[in-house]
A protein has these predicted regions:
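N-terminal beta1-alpha1 ligand-phosphate binding loop
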Residues: 3-25
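Short glycine-/small-residue-rich Rossmann-like dinucleotide-binding loops
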Residues: 52-53
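Short, Lys/Arg-enriched, disordered terminal segments
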Residues: 1-3, 197-198
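Hydrophobic anchor at the start of a short beta-strand
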Residues: 4, 28-31, 98, 129
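Structural motif
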Residues: 45-48, 97
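Short loop/helix-cap segments at secondary-structure boundaries that form the rim of catalytic
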Residues: 23, 38-43, 126
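A short, well-structured beta->alpha microelement
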Residues: 27-39
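FMN-binding flavodoxin-like domain, especially the glycine-rich phosphate-binding loop
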Residues: 56-198
Length: 198
């Protein structure tokens, strides 16, 4: 697919793997956000950003959102009738299409998805962004420093609930946190491919 780029932030590998699969399917490049330059965005009509979820935030999404903020505001103004299609065309934004993917081990839980959207897309102009939730993998033995501390705290919070408050999802999460998990699945990128090729 011409003029498409997949930008990602990956710490343990799942986001990079999904980015590579998406790029392969779309016939484009995948590049880490550290290697990508903001000024190069103008060369692409379709931009996909993805990153792992940590403490409710999508890694480096704030940096990416700063890059595309003016585009999103213009698209929002167009959708709300504040500017015309001609105005949008003049801005060079009219054909640009963005999508976001988040990778984590608790993203099949609808409440977790909503929290993620609330935390990462607080402004009205951000809410238009399609966001896809992809299952990652987790290996507790690989964690160090702050990552280990965050996961230990999350585990303590769940285990600290009263027995009657612990949900089935909490039990699954405790198992993942204690034993690790490998949930990564290439088939889960299909909705992203469909979104970017429609």
């Amino acid at each position: 697919m011409e003029k498409t780029i997949v930008i990602y932030k990956s710490k343990y590998g799942s986001s990079a793997q999904y980015a590579a699969w998406i790029a392969e399917e779309l016939g484009c490049r995948a590049v880490s956000i550290e290697e990508f330059k903001k000024n190069d965005l103008k060369n692409y009509d379709n931009v996909i950003y993805g990153g792992g979820v940590q403490a409710g935030g999508i890694k480096e999404l704030d940096k990416f959102m700063k890059w595309i903020k003016s585009d999103l505001k213009l698209l929002d103004m167009y959708r709300s009738g504040k500017i015309t299609a001609e105005d949008l065309e003049k801005s060079g934004v009219s054909d640009r299409h963005y999508a976001i993917f988040a990778v984590g081990i608790n993203l099949d839980d609808m409440e977790a998805r909503q929290q993620l959207r609330d935390i990462n897309f607080p402004k009205s102009y951000m809410k238009q962004l399609p966001c896809f939730f992809l299952p990652g993998e987790y290996h507790p033995e690989n964690l160090k420093g702050a990552d280990k501390m965050i996961m230990n705290l999350a585990q303590k919070m769940i285990k600290g609930k009263r027995e009657s408050e612990i949900t089935d999802n909490d039990k699954v999460m405790i198992s993942y946190m204690e034993n690790g998990c490998k949930l990564i699945d290439r088939q889960r990128i299909r909705p992203i491919i469909e979104e970017m090729t429609r």
